[in-house]
Amino acid sequence: MTGSWEARYAAEFFGTLILVLLGNGAVANAFLKNTTGNDDPGLANGGWLLVASGYGLGVMLPAMMFGSISGNHLNPAITIGQAVIGIFPWAHVAPYLIWQFLGAIAGQCLILALYWPHYRQTTDNEAVLGTFATSDHANSQLNGFVTEMVGTAVLIFGAMGLYRGMFFHQNIDIANIGVGLLIAAMVISLGGPTGPALNPARDLGPRLVHALFPVPNKGSSHWEYSWVPVVAPIVGAVIGIWIYKIFFGL
């Protein structure tokens, strides 16, 4: 990583903003009424592939833009996981997390503004919430926790392999593409139960926007579930990075 810590904080802010804008923006295009991606809420022309592509590109493009500056965490679980393992300084964990959450909030505010007419036309309040935050479709916090934990563990393990592998370590742009594809694959394969979040900032920041702003046709923000996509990804990240260290070293 290069540049001052202030530049790294800015990179985390704008990177997370872009992640949420492209990822949650794809969800909005897929599930809000009368968008170009969907004529009926919940019946997207692009389907889940549209959403997966949004999140995959939402991680890949900021990685290409800001990876050399901040490491392109964009995710409190990654930051905390790296700190636990000793490859990121604890002194800068809190600032990274703050700017990641602020970036997620800013990205969601842009989505709300840009899709405002479509929020007004969408009467399904669960579809509306889905463009902000996640929930467990089986109404099970345990199922949600396990899904988010396992998904994030696989994500971090895979990302470590891509960025630290012998070939990809010398071809960082290809590694960035690989991480984008990994995110898209995770959304396709593990998106059924919860969404998924895999990222505390991507869920909690937009959930705050849903709760605090006068979103048309909104229902509950489901705060009883909100701890799951915050705690589970952090636990999963620590597990994933420890497994990688045990078998392959750092």
Curated annotation (Swiss-Prot):
Belongs to the MIP/aquaporin (TC 1.A.8) family. The keyword Disulfide bond does not apply. The gene is glpF5. The lineage of its organism: Bacteria, Bacillati, Bacillota, Bacilli, Lactobacillales. Its main location: membrane. This is Glycerol uptake facilitator protein-like 5. CDD domains: MIP. Probable transporter that facilitates the transmembrane diffusion of an unknown substrate. Is not permeable to water, dihydroxyacetone, glycerol, urea, H(2)O(2) and D/L-lactic acid. The keyword Transmembrane applies. A motif (NPA 1) lies at residues 75-77. It is a multi-pass membrane protein.
